[in-house]
Amino acid sequence: MELRTLRYHAIAVAILIFIFFIISTLASNLVVPTRYTIDKTAPMYLDYAYYIDETKTKTFDTIINQPELLTHQPFSDVPWSFSQQNYWLFLDLENKSLNKQNVVAHFDNPMVDHLTVYRLDKNNKLVETYKLGDKEEALSLFEYSVPHIRFLVERKSSQRLVIKIDTIGISKTPVNLYRDKEFIDL
């Protein structure tokens, strides 16, 4: 009788371990969306910089024409705070692939008031401006809840995204770049 009970307990433990393995595998794939960012799935090279405008007086032209103001550090090093200040994030993208890349920039803060994204070519000429944020009108429900932009990076070319974050409250806005397919799959 004890052997039979021991056998049932061993089978129950094996099933429990198998279930925990499946749950941990699924959870690790769902919890870490940065695993699928473009710098890990395509030959796209990224360079980061930022500037904190404590006076909220700097304009786009001022920031672009004074590159010495920038701090060249990853966005994870930005000293985010609740103070009334503008954050200017610079993201240089270089597509070293022989294929063009459809890119989605996801701004992971649905509570940001005003988020302006300037897309520049390699000569710092403005290509397009995007306005996102919960104070902006004429956005789709998806753009309100998941702030993002879509754009194309041609093969063997580079672009720059300049992101201005102007908000009251939580200003921390992680920026993740995905290929279009991976963004849809997430």
Mark where each language-model region is.
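Bacterial N-terminal signal peptides that target proteins for export
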Residues: 2-13
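Bacterial N-terminal signal peptides
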Residues: 13-22
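Soluble non-transmembrane domains of integral membrane proteins
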Residues: 27-186
